[in-house]
Regions:
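C-terminal catalytic/motor cores of large multi-domain enzyme assemblies
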Residues: 1-292
Length: 292
């Protein structure tokens, strides 16, 4: 990401945008809540090449822990790096360009209903590749499952033990701090609601990909649910039906950060990367040629 000198009105986590067109600026006031400005995209991704790619990597190295989810994370991060408007957010009725690319998801400590959940936020550098991301996810998830709770989890546990009137006062204070961009970095750095993209890998529990709402709290502008990989009959290049490995993505976006044409081209880029996973062996900042 291009670094710029901090100016008056910038936040710790983003640079204020002062050249927003009148339509979008008006939307920030007419639709002040993120949940009022949600749009939804359901997209079917062909992951046949991803399945082959993982098999090839495991044949080369039996210790490889590469998973389809790791490739999805890398592909989404690469898309955000090359479609910068996706890394914008609206806070306090102003527009900002986020300083970093971060993807977040919830980690269940054990695979059962009673297990506690923890939050994981990955800050992804532009020179990162798929191998770096796979190692980081594998290591961070193991650390969460084996270790203690993070700062945000501990704060939430403390909050849950307070009397209701105190909880209401704290929540009101948090909303004020959030509006003016004054939330402590010790909290926001580990809070999934302050990430570029929030992911939910529903496929890991054998489910499809529903649409998930955004949150008015925080700065997250994109939510993606990932369904279960399955085989499906789809039209081939010559029009004849073929069986392919596919997965559904349920994408929810804040329409105030860009327009429909921009979102559509961004999804097309994401599909191209997913269908060509070898592109992720290069640093994420490396360009991609595709028909937009």
């Amino acid at each position: 990401m291009t670094k710029t000198k901090k100016r008056w009105g910038d936040r710790k986590d983003g640079r204020r945008l002062r050249d927003i067109d009148g339509l979008h600026q008006a939307m920030a006031h007419l639709l002040p809540n993120r949940c009022d400005a949600e749009i939804f995209i359901k997209e079917k991704m062909d992951v046949t090449n991803i399945i082959r790619y993982i098999e090839e990597k495991k044949a080369e190295d039996q210790a490889s822990k590469l998973k389809a989810f790791h490739i999805f994370v890398a592909a989404i991060a690469k898309t955000v790096y090359h479609r910068e408007l996706l890394n914008r957010f609206v806070a306090g009725r102003r527009f900002y360009q986020r300083n970093v690319v971060s993807l977040a998801f919830v980690v269940r400590r054990e695979f059962n209903e009673e297990s506690e959940e923890s939050l994981l936020v990955l800050k992804i550098n532009e020179d990162t590749d798929i191998n770096d991301i796979s190692r980081k996810i594998t290591g961070d998830v193991k650390e969460i499952k084996d270790g203690e709770k993070g700062n945000v989890d501990k704060v939430l546990d403390l909050f849950s033990g307070l009397p209701r009137p105190i909880q209401m006062l704290v929540a009101k204070l948090v909303r004020i701090l959030d509006f003016f961009g004054k939330m402590p970095e010790a909290i926001t750095s580990g809070d999934t609601n302050y990430s570029s993209v929030l992911l939910s890998n529903i496929g890991s529990i054998k489910c499809g990909a529903p649409y998930h709402h955004l949150n008015n709290y925080g700065t997250n502008s994109i939510m993606i649910t990932i369904g279960e990989i399955h085989k499906e009959q789809v039209p081939g290049k010559n029009g004849m039906p073929v069986i392919r490995d596919v997965v559904d993505f349920g994408i929810t976006l804040d329409e105030r950060i860009a327009d429909g044409f921009y979102f559509a081209r961004s999804v097309k880029l994401l599909k191209h990367i997913i269908e060509n996973p070898a592109l992720l062996e290069e640093p994420l900042i490396e360009g991609v040629e595709y028909e937009g």
